[in-house]
From Swiss-Prot:
It comes from Aromatoleum aromaticum (strain DSM 19018 / LMG 30748 / EbN1). The keyword Transferase applies. One of its GO terms (biological process) is L-tryptophan biosynthetic process. One of its GO terms (molecular function) is anthranilate phosphoribosyltransferase activity. This is Anthranilate phosphoribosyltransferase. Homodimer. The gene is trpD. It comes from the Bacteria.
Amino acid sequence: MTITAQEALQRTIDHREIFYDEMLSLMRQIMAGEISPLMTAAIITGLRVKKETIGEITAAATVMRELATKVTVPGPDRNFLDVVGTGGDGANTFNISTTTIFVAAAAGARVAKHGGRSVSSKSGAADVLEALGVKLGLAPEQVAESIEATGIGFMYAPAHHSAMKNVAAVRREMGVRTIFNILGPLTNPASAPNTLMGVFHPDLVGIQARVMQRLGANHVLVVYGMDGMDEVSLGASTMVGELKDGEIREYQIHPEDFGLQMMGTRNLAVESAEQSKATLLGVLDNRPGPAREIVILNAGVALYTANLVDSIAVGIGRARELIESGAARAKLDEFIAFNRKFA
């Protein structure tokens, strides 16, 4: 079922839903550059104001997945993981989720990390990995080879979502969060079935979990720190939307549930990718402090999401062991060394 740009805009003005098949049509038009930048900006603003529905987000993510340059990774999916965030929490923390992937891979997860450069923070996943010497924009078969060899592959979002070029200028000029901010974590080009996803607003916890359910995901934890972080927080309770065995459960977790001391997260902020790199290396070198503790917490949740442990508590204990033993740092070094062969 097709819908014109004008009809879609009117629907948002009236605070009425754009139905799934209509949203498929609309997104295909937008991504093909068939709708003008002015109308694209108006429509995505209208969607934001009326609040995007689960059906609208699912349809938009489906189109982005259709158009993505995919990465095919053979082998079992049970421990195949992405750790990703929407960004936009305004905290400017170091790259917690990127640090977490090295702990997860050291535990035996296969990680297909999907991300880009910073939009709203001081250092995006691509920025800190580049600072570490990682080559961005590998071909799909090279990403797959890296996952097979090291347990980690990084998919640089612009290399896999070329159709986004048709909305890039609009997003940049608008400078506000739109539906595209929440689509990135839903559109992993390797179709990792297990995802630890941080979000920037509490309403998105249940929404993103239900979108992932409709998209056929296996095990997903969507998290929002009550202090505003799009991570599992050390400074407050964290809202969780968990998809497991086809069912969704929403609950809260607290650092002290797992024997972790609550710590303020203000001193986790960085001003640059180089600073984030230094913090990441400090964590993986087992330097004590809140940065290490928040990675242990998030990595524990990641191990649970990847079905490597039966509970978050066990995952946290395992994550601490992997950092203290040097296994997580060794995994980082292995990934960088393997990646250099493509330079």
